[in-house]
């Protein structure tokens, strides 16, 4: 894995850029969330920043433009993008945790029948992210801007966390979204990346809740440390691509360009980019023959270069 050095000087001036960040509430006691931390950094660099959330910040942040928005509502998100129009930097940061870590494992019954678990996390952590990314891409293409999309994932989307199965699953999914879209959006002058925070002090995980973890030696990060990784992911450069896809060759990997398709793990005071080494290791855990078949399938279906589109003759409601 690649260790990164990121500090405020890593972020260029952002005058003339417009950013949209979801879920940026200030919480009592002076703590702030990851999204708000990213928003403050961009404001300091001269960007115009819109914060989207259900609740307005409890204290004013100079220059921050607040828009009340339920990120789980397609129409509400669409209205915001229609209003702002030209968006250069889009941060899908909204997320919620399991209300009870044991809830998925509990056998809660109603009249003797097992109750369906609360899946509101899927609406916020996955469906809202899918909608946000789609709307951001549409806006960036329509206005022909050089765009960047960054998703707040989680370390639990990289390694298993048995105490939060649904939360972890949603974070695995959004990292999968980055891997899926990175070879497509870049051709539209749009990058997509993610940041996967380990334990971070935020409104969802206040400082007092971190004390037992710190006493056990668990490393934690402040919100502004993670927020800096979000902004870096939107503006950084790279000396090679993460991987070749479809009909691309291995030589294509060596192309310099904008930071794209990458995931930064934040843990304590360290930044680690994980996707490049993960991609390099693929032959080890798939085997050469399997990987060759995967690449062949990608090449056949690579619609960027005239690939075959697979469609089913069955009605959509009959698809497995």
UniProtKB/Swiss-Prot annotation:
The keyword Cytoplasm does not apply. It is an enzyme of class 1 (oxidoreductase). InterPro entries: NAD(P)-bd_dom_sf, Sc_DH/Rdtase_CS, SDR_fam. It holds the Pfam family adh_short. Its EC number is 1.-.-.-. The gene is ATR7. NADP(+) binds at residues 32, 34, 55, 70, 93, 134, 167, 171, 202. Keywords: NADP, Oxidoreductase. The keyword Oxidoreductase applies. PANTHER family: 3-OXOACYL-(ACYL-CARRIER-PROTEIN) REDUCTASE (AFU_ORTHOLOGUE AFUA_6G11210) (PTHR43180), NAD(P)-BINDING PROTEIN (PTHR43180:SF80). SUPFAM superfamilies: NAD(P)-binding Rossmann-fold domains. GO terms for molecular function: oxidoreductase activity. It comes from the Eukaryota. Belongs to the short-chain dehydrogenases/reductases (SDR) family. This is Short-chain dehydrogenase/reductase ATR7. Short-chain dehydrogenase/reductase; part of the core atranone cluster (CAC) which products are predicted to catalyze most or all steps of mycotoxin atranone synthesis, starting from geranylgeranyl pyrophosphate (GGPP). The initial cyclization of GGPP to dolabellane is probably performed by the terpene cyclase ATR13. The Baeyer-Villiger oxidation near the end of the atranone synthesis, which converts atranones D and E to atranones F and G is predicted to be catalyzed by the monooxygenase ATR8. The active site is at 167 (proton acceptor), 171 (lowers pka of active site tyr).
């Amino acid at each position: 894995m690649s260790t990164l050095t990121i500090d405020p000087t890593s972020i260029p001036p952002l005058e003339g850029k417009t950013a949209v960040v979801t879920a940026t509430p200030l919480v009592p006691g002076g703590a702030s969330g990851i999204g708000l931390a990213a928003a403050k950094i961009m404001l300091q660099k001269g960007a115009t920043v819109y914060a989207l959330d259900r609740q307005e910040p409890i204290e004013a942040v100079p220059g921050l433009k607040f828009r009340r928005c339920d990120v789980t509502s397609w129409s509400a998100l669409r209205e915001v993008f229609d209003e702002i129009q030209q968006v250069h930097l889009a941060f899908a940061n909204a997320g919620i945790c399991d209300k009870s870590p044991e809830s998925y494992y509990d056998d809660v019954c109603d009249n003797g029948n097992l109750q369906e678990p609360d899946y509101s996390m899927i609406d916020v952590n996955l469906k809202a992210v899918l909608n946000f990314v789609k709307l951001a891409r549409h806006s960036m293409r329509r206005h022909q801007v050089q765009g960047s999309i960054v998703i707040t994932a989680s370390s639990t989307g990289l390694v298993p966390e048995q105490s939060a199965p649904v939360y972890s699953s949603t974070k695995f999914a959004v990292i999968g979204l980055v891997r899926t879209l990175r070879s497509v959006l870049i051709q539209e002058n749009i990058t997509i990346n993610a940041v996967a925070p380990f334990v971070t002090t935020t409104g969802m995980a206040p400082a007092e809740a971190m004390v037992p973890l710190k006493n056990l030696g668990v490393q934690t990060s402040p919100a502004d440390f993670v927020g800096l990784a979000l902004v870096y992911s939107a503006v950084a450069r790279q000396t090679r691509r993460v991987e070749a896809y479809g009909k691309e060759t291995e030589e294509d990997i060596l192309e310099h360009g904008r930071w794209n398709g990458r995931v930064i793990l934040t843990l304590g005071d360290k930044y680690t980019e994980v996707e490049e080494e993960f991609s390099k290791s693929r032959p080890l855990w798939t085997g050469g023959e399997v990987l060759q078949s995967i690449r062949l399938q990608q090449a056949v279906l690579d619609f960027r270069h005239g690939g075959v589109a697979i469609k089913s003759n069955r009605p959509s409601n009959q698809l497995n």
